[in-house]
C-alpha cells in the first residue's frame, strides 16, 4: 500500500533537532517515514534508528527510504529504547524524535478501524500481533470501565451516557464495526451538543485507541529513558496531538529541567541536578498554511529539550 502520509511540523522539528552529519539519531515513531527521510538527507557518516511497532509502517517506509543504507529498522515500541540501543551496541545518541498518536496512513488503511469516518471492524491496534483490540474494550468492559476510559482518555463530558448506551446496545448483540459504534455515540449525545464542535465520535474513538495501545502508560518513563541515552547537547523533539499527551511531555521535561525536591525557600540539599534545558518555552504550533494543507496538524504541538 502506498501511504500519502504528510509529516506534521516537519521543517520545525528538523531545525530543532540540530542534526550533525555524523550523528546517530532515533525516530521512535517511523510511521510514513517523512521525518526519517529529512533526517537521512542531512546525514553523511551518521546513522538513523527507525522504530515502529506497526510492521506495515516499516515495510512502507523501507520502500520509501530504499536509497539510504544507513538506517536500522526496528519493529518494537519506542518505550523499549534502552533495550533496543543495547541490542545494537549503541551507548548514546545525538537526537530523538517522537511523533505520537495515530498516523495518517493508519487512518487511511480502512480495515485497521482507527477512523470514525469509514466503516471497518473494531480493531485499532497499532501492533497487529497484540491479542487485545477495540472489540474487547467495547464488548467486554463493564459500564463503569467504559465510562472511565471515555472520560479519562477522551475528556468526553457525555462519557456516562455513551458508556450506558454501549452496554444497552450490546445486549442485543456484539458491536463489531466502527459505524455501529458511531451510531451508538450519536444516539447517546443530545442533538444540541452534536451540532457544535468536532465529530461526536472523535473523543470516544481517541479514548478507546489510547486504551487499546496503552499510549499514555509509561510515556513519562520512556521520555526519561530517552533523555538518559542522549549525548550532551543532544535533543529530544516530541510532537503531541491532544492535551493528555502534551501534559505528560510538558511535565516530564519540567521535572528533568528542575528535579530539585527541596522546599522553594530553602537552599537545595537534595543534590538533584538539572538534566535538560527546555528549548521551547511554549510549544511550537503549526502555521496557518500547514493546517490548510494538512488538517491532521491542527492539534499538533512540538516540545523540545536539550541534554545538559
Swiss-Prot record:
GO terms for molecular function: rRNA (cytosine-N4-)-methyltransferase activity. GO terms for biological process: rRNA base methylation. Pfam families: Methyltransf_5. InterPro entries: RsmH, SAM-dep_MeTrfase_MraW_recog, SAM-dependent_MTases_sf. It is found in: Cytoplasm. Keywords: Cytoplasm, Methyltransferase, rRNA processing, S-adenosyl-L-methionine, Transferase. S-adenosyl-L-methionine binds at residues 33-35, 52, 78, 99, 106. Residues 289-308 are annotated as: Disordered. One of its GO terms (cellular component) is cytoplasm. The keyword Transferase applies. Specifically methylates the N4 position of cytidine in position 1402 (C1402) of 16S rRNA. The keyword S-adenosyl-L-methionine applies. NCBIfam families: 16S rRNA (cytosine(1402)-N(4))-methyltransferase RsmH. Gene3D superfamilies: Putative methyltransferase TM0872, insert domain (1.10.150.170), Vaccinia Virus protein VP39 (3.40.50.150). It catalyses: cytidine(1402) in 16S rRNA + S-adenosyl-L-methionine = N(4)-methylcytidine(1402) in 16S rRNA + S-adenosyl-L-homocysteine + H(+). Belongs to the methyltransferase superfamily. RsmH family. Disulfide bonds: none annotated. Its EC number is 2.1.1.199. It comes from the Bacteria. This is Ribosomal RNA small subunit methyltransferase H. Its main location: cytoplasm.
Amino acid at each position: 500500500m502506498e501511504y500519502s502520509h504528510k509529516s506534521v511540523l516537519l521543517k520545525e522539528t528538523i531545525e530543532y533537532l540540530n542534526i550533525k552529519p555524523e550523528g546517530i539519531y532515533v525516530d521512535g515513531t517511523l510511521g510514513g517515514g517523512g521525518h526519517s527521510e529529512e533526517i537521512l538527507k542531512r546525514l553523511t557518516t551518521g546513522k538513523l534508528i527507525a522504530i515502529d511497532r506497526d510492521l506495515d509502517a516499516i515495510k512502507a517506509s523501507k520502500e520509501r527510504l530504499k536509497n539510504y543504507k544507513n538506517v536500522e529498522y526496528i519493529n518494537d515500541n519506542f518505550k523499549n529504547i534502552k533495550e533496543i540501543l543495547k541490542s545494537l551496541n549503541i551507548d548514546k545518541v545525538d537526537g530523538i524524535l517522537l511523533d505520537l498518536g495515530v498516523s495518517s496512513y493508519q487512518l487511511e488503511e480502512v480495515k485497521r478501524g482507527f477512523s470514525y469516518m469509514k466503516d471497518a471492524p473494531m480493531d485499532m491496534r497499532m501492533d497487529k500481533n497484540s491479542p487485545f483490540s477495540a472489540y474487547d474494550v467495547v464488548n467486554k468492559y463493564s459500564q463503569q470501565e467504559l465510562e472511565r476510559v471515555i472520560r479519562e482518555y477522551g475528556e468526553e463530558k457525555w462519557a456516562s451516557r455513551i458508556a450506558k448506551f454501549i452496554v444497552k446496545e450490546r445486549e442485543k448483540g456484539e458491536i463489531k464495526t466502527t459505524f455501529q459504534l458511531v451510531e451508538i455515540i450519536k444516539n447517546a449525545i443530545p442533538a444540541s451538543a452534536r451540532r457544535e464542535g468536532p465529530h461526536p465520535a472523535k473523543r470516544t474513538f481517541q479514548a478507546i485507541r489510547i486504551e487499546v495501545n496503552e499510549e499514555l502508560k509509561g510515556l513519562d518513563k520512556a521520555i526519561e529513558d530517552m533523555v538518559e541515552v542522549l549525548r550532551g547537547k543532544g535533543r529530544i523533539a516530541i510532537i503531541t496531538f491532544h492535551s493528555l499527551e502534551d501534559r505528560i511531555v510538558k511535565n516530564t521535561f519540567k521535572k528533568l529541567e528542575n528535579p530539585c525536591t527541596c522546599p522553594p525557600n530553602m537552599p537545595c540539599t537534595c543534590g538533584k541536578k538539572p538534566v535538560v534545558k527546555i528549548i521551547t518555552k511554549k510549544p511550537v504550533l503549526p502555521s496557518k498554511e500547514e493546517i490548510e494543507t494538512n488538517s491532521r496538524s491542527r492539534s499538533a504541538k512540538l516540545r523540545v529539550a536539550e541534554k545538559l
